[in-house]
Amino acid sequence: MNDASSDPGIPGRPGDVVAAAAPREVGALVFRPLEIDTWQEHVIYMHPDCPVCRAEGFSAQARVRVQIGDRSLIATLTLLGAPLLNTGEASLSLSAARTLSARAGDVVHVTHAPALESVRALRAKIYGCHLDSVQLDGIIGDISAGRYADVHIAAFLTACADGRMSLRETVDLTRAMVRSGQRLNWDREVVADKHCVGGLPGNRTTPVVVAIAAAAGLLLPKTSSRAITSPAGTADTMEALTRVTLDSTELRRVVEQVGAALVWGGALSLSPADDVLIRVERALDIDSDAQLVASILSKKIAAGSTHVLIDVPVGPTAKIREDSDLARLDLAMTKVADAFGLKLRILRTDGSQPVGRGVGPALEALDVLAVLQCQPTAPADLRERSLLLAGELLEFCGAIPPGQGRLLAGSLLDSGAAWARFQAICEAQGGLRTPGQAVFRRDVVAARSGIVTSVDNRHVARTAKLAGAPRRQVAGLELHVRAGDEVVAGAPLCTLHAQASGELEYAFSYALAHDPFRIE
């Protein structure tokens, strides 16, 4: 038996020869690592003729309980024959193997998964019924415990989309998601937070706002998500600059040391059900109002925030397209916030076009550094949006009298105080690093001369994602024009950045076919 890895969290390497040793117990199998990546979905692989499959009557896609030692999880069964597996062997997806700390040769016990009572509530929701708090607690509890397959999660997300959740259900969903994880307490009257609902490429204001607010003396333990349907989330961008995977003890140390943090919320078990939902949402490319509200506010509540500023960009190609959509979102967020005693302020901002130049984690990180360092070439729109939001947050939290927030924010940025605080945050989290650069680049040029009348947010975001963002940290695109700019034929409109030539060409072809820039 050959185990190529000394790390118990990385179960062997492809091609390892694992002897088909006889299991030590009846009804058990021997673990053989195959390193199959299912993107965090727990899957077990068994031979269709293995004695356990026959004895238990397992078939493909069955939900089964998998145990190695004292650790267990629920997984989806996939049948896999020779030569990859023998009848006495089983394998696990990478995420399942890591969860169970599986090593080559371990004894694997596989039994039927217990029936899930919450599936009845899920079916009811699919048919349009309203769910009560007990039913939603059951669904979210099973999701956070890993008992739902991705198909069940996708069904739940779809059943809750397109206005199918009432305000009462949204409150109960948020409460269930808060209960699914730990809840932080900072023992302070004011714990500030800022969030953008997304849908606008670039717009990486959060790191700048956090640095300014922390320099003004506000406590800001900022937890952020990774991208759901966008080319980058705040956590993705910050990861290009520093370590963002901190546990709650490390987070508390950083906040006590420098007054703020910028970390990935998924490492803290704050509303862990939301992290599972986000993973499936990413594949579905959907983001419903109820789920959006519950996702945002459950994590703010769990993080111990008391005052939350929500940036809502509104524009024809943004996530929120009309003021009527904003009004509906405002009502839902206010209702949920009131139920938890959370102070909330929603700020409507211009969502007509991207903000900043970079779209993608590393490229957005460069914009953040340029603004914080007050570089002459820093994107003016990102600077102004950041100062607007920072000033609003300072006033909302009582750090400055009304009407003076923008002035104080500008002073803290121009004096270098915000940059110094940002450096301190990054150093406390593990050190500040320089964002990487992509191997391949290609310009998308203007086909004609004229005025850029609009920039399509969705096509810009899609192009950046096809180039590899956020999966490849350095991938994305760099914008060279904004609406209102005059261009000549052949002038670069944006530059694509990619780590693979195939992704570069794919993104380039999409940009040519869908042209994010309208020129008249």
From Swiss-Prot:
UniProt keywords, alphabetically: Glycosyltransferase, Transferase
Example of a GO MF term: thymidine phosphorylase activity
Gene Ontology annotations of biological process type: pyrimidine nucleobase metabolic process; pyrimidine nucleoside metabolic process
InterPro entries with a match to the protein in the record: Glycosyl_Trfase_fam3, Glycosyl_Trfase_fam3_N_dom, Glycosyl_Trfase_fam3_N_dom_sf, Nuc_phospho_transferase, PYNP-like_C_sf, PYNP_C, Pyrmidine_PPase_CS, Thym_Pase_Put
Protein origin, superkingdom: Bacteria
PROSITE patterns: THYMID_PHOSPHORYLASE (PS00647)
EC nos: 2.4.2.4
One cellular component (GO) term of this entry: cytosol
Reactions catalysed according to its record: thymidine + phosphate = 2-deoxy-alpha-D-ribose 1-phosphate + thymine
Pfam family, one: PYNP_C
Identification of the protein by name: Putative thymidine phosphorylase 1
